[in-house]
Design a protein with these regions (language model features):
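Enzymes that bind and transform nitrogen-containing heteroaromatic metabolites
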Residues: 3-25, 40, 60, 64, ...
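Short acidic/polar alpha-helix capping motifs at helix-coil junctions
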Residues: 20-21, 50-54, 76-81, 144-146, ...
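Proteins enriched for Cys/Gly/acidic motifs involved in redox and nucleic-acid/cofactor modification
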Residues: 20-21, 128-156
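N-terminal glycine-rich anion-binding loops that anchor highly charged ligand groups
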Residues: 21-35
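Zn2+-dependent cytidine deaminase-like catalytic core
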Residues: 31, 36-132, 216, 290
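Short capping loops/turns at secondary-structure boundaries
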Residues: 106, 110, 126-129, 144-148, ...
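Short low-complexity, flexible loop/linker segments enriched in glycine and/or proline
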Residues: 113-115, 139-142, 207-209
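Hydrophobic, well-ordered secondary-structure segments
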Residues: 114, 130-137, 178-185
Length: 341
């Protein structure tokens, strides 16, 4: 129970950097001496100190370290990247014990960090709150194990399951829901829409309702029908345009030529190559349905305005899963789903 308490604190610390560590995972670390936390830290962003190093640096009396336990939510790294291996630093400082939440499935780690520490004669325990630690880095693990980005589907629908009225932009989500969605955009690496959504709504796909980073924008526009003066082509964020016409870069816009056959699968493969760890798919209905039919999704979020009846327009995607959780947002509800297949 004591180990779980400190690993839970590691998770809390790691969550402070959601959306900022790509392509690295979220990691938190706590150092405990005689039942008292004497140091803690988390990984802030790629290229900067890892969680363990920040925790070590925060310890005022370094002489206590050989009699201390270091807790870390993810297996310490074992390779030289932009920073030296944390496993070697832990061995060098001679910690009494190391407690790990989840093992790191990345090819360069994958048990090597734990082995370095164990071979140095330091007691190592792993798998503490493993499920929670894996869920913390669901994007990172999906990216490395499934070799594709973590996919979140999101749409808003009326009580009679339409996404708009008369195929025109229609207000379905309330202001509270919009804030929540913009937080989600800040958390995910990229955001994706199709041609029809770009033409009809002319969205900028930036994070406006809260203070935060803009995700990488992804546009599926097979025949390049979206005019270059539309908001998606603004210089506010890096933008990838998957199409069947041309390849090349123009400022912050990258055109990626992709075969029409197995388009979604080929696009996800390319996004993996580009180190995009997660995408939120915001529409339209046809694009969302393609992801659903191919079973290429990890989580789905449906915003429902049950009191709104639109009678006609774009029909919401066909989706028959059972929600894992339902939250009220005033006159909206949001249903959350996880793919168990």
């Amino acid at each position: 129970m004591q180990d779980e308490f400190y690993i839970r604190r590691c998770i809390e610390l790691a969550q402070k950097a959601i959306g900022n560590t790509y392509p690295n995972p979220l990691v938190g670390s706590v150092i405990v001496h005689n039942g008292k936390i004497i140091g803690e830290g988390y990984h802030h962003k790629a290229g900067e100190n890892h969680a363990e190093i920040n925790a070590i640096n925060s310890v005022e009396d370094k002489s206590l370290i050989p009699e201390s336990t270091i807790y870390v939510s993810l297996e310490p790294c074992a390779h030289f990247g932009k920073t030296p291996p944390c496993a070697l630093k832990i061995v060098e400082l001679g910690f009494k014990k190391v407690v790990i939440g989840a093992m790191d499935s990345h090819d360069k780690v994958n048990g090597k960090g734990k082995k370095i520490i164990h071979d140095a004669g330091i007691e190592v325990v792993s798998g503490v709150l493993e499920k929670e630690c894996i869920d913390l880095n669901k994007r990172f693990f999906t990216y490395h194990e499934k070799r594709r980005p973590f996919v979140v589907l999101k749409w808003a629908e009326s009580g009679d399951r339409f996404m708009d009225k008369d195929f025109k932009p229609t207000q379905i989500s309330n202001s509270l829901t919009k804030q929540f969605v913009h937080q989600l955009r800040n958390n995910e690496h990229s955001i994706l829409i199709g041609t029809m959504t770009a033409l009809r709504d002319n969205p900028s796909l930036t994070t406006r309702e809260i203070v935060g980073r803009n995700p990488i924008r992804i546009l599926i526009d097979i025949d390049l029908k979206v005019p270059s003066d539309f908001n998606i082509y603004s210089n506010e964020a890096e933008t990838l345009v998957f199409n069947s016409v041309k390849e090349g870069e123009e400022g912050n816009i990258k055109f990626i030529k992709t075969s029409r056959e197995n388009f979604i699968e080929n696009m996800l493969k390319k996004l993996h190559e580009l180190q995009i760890q997660s995408i939120i798919v915001e529409g339209g209905s046809l694009v969302l349905q393609q992801f659903i039919d191919a079973n290429l999704w990890d989580e789905t979020m449906i915003i429902k305005n049950k009191n709104l009846v639109l009678e006609n327009g774009t029909k919401a995607p066909r989706f028959s899963e059972i929600p894992l959780e339902i939250q009220d947002f005033r006159d909206n509800v949001i249903e959350f789903y996880k793919n168990s297949h």
